[in-house]
A protein has these predicted regions:
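ABC family nucleotide-binding domain
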Residues: 11-243
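C-terminal boundary and immediately downstream tail of ABC-type ATPase nucleotide-binding domains
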Residues: 2, 231-234, 244-263
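Extreme N-terminus of proteins, especially the signal/transit-peptide cleavage junction
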Residues: 2-12
Length: 263
């Protein structure tokens, strides 16, 4: 992959500066900033509607921010303003390159239903990265073994449990060898008894030093795996710090109320 890092860019795997996002007249993000260094695991917490998922979707350009700047691996995503006040990316090839470097795992799995688990995992490496099919299969089988579903390689998603589908989705994201993993509430659509198997995989990825941004309602898990926790409230960063700072010594009343409601 071509490296186009800017020597003057702020250091970090992901840097977000003063990000704003509006849907019509509703401003969902009101100037959010964050910085993730290589190997950081940042959990983004907050009530529903606080802007957590929108923030992740703006980072990989599934949503286009209205204002602010985003650097991925020290490469600034170039945007241009439209007369309408909206913005759009300047370079579609840059968007493709940025997205290929970010692994995204959604709460709803988003597996292709007409493909087997193995076919889901090799699809993007073969067609986007142009990895030889034999090598892509080899890597995919190793990833399916890593997430504990190697025996499901020839199954279709509809034949898997929710936890197995989400682990397949994680393997699919990892198959692109991303620089950063983005998890958007990866356990919220799962039955309670299946949550643990997905969290174990994410914990392993954290322990291996992967850079990750994790939107989650699993407070105990966030405390255990995160290097940093960010609490969003009504589209703004209300609190930010280490897990000990945020969970044990929160400064704002809003996060105290939020954490109390989680028990």
């Amino acid at each position: 992959m071509v490296s186009v890092a800017d020597a003057t860019a702020p250091s970090g795997a992901i840097v977000v500066e003063d990000l704003h996002k509006r849907f019509g007249k509703l401003e969902v993000l009101k100037g959010v900033s964050l910085q993730a260094q290589q190997g950081d695991v940042i959990s983004i917490i907050g009530s529903s509607g606080s802007g957590k998922s929108t923030l992740l979707r703006c980072i990989n350009l599934l949503e286009i921010p209205n204002d602010g700047r985003v650097w991925v691996n020290r490469e600034l995503i170039r945007m241009r303003k439209l007369r309408s006040g909206e913005a759009e990316p300047e370079d579609s090839k840059q968007v493709d390159r940025i997205r290929a470097s970010l692994g995204m795992v959604f709460q709803s799995f988003n597996l292709w239903s007409h493909m087997t688990v193995l076919e889901n995992v090799i699809e993007a490496p073969v067609h986007v990265l142009k990895v030889p099919r034999k090598l892509a299969i080899e890597r995919a089988l190793a990833l399916l073994d890593k997430v504990g579903i190697a025996d499901k390689r020839d199954h279709y998603p509809s034949h898997l449990s929710g936890g197995q589908q989400q682990r397949a989705a994680i393997a699919r994201a990892l198959a692109m060898q991303p620089k950063v993993m983005l998890f958007d509430e990866p356990t919220s659509a799962l039955d309670p008894e299946l949550v643990g198997e997905v969290l174990r995989v994410i914990r392993q990825l954290a322990e291996e030093g992967n850079t990750m941004l994790l939107v989650t309602h699993e407070m105990r898990f966030a405390r255990e795996v995160s290097s940093k926790v960010i609490f969003l409230h009504q589209g703004r960063t209300e609190e930010e710090g280490t897990p000990a700072e945020v969970f044990d010594n929160p400064r704002s009343e809003r996060i105290r109320q939020f954490l109390k409601a989680q028990h």
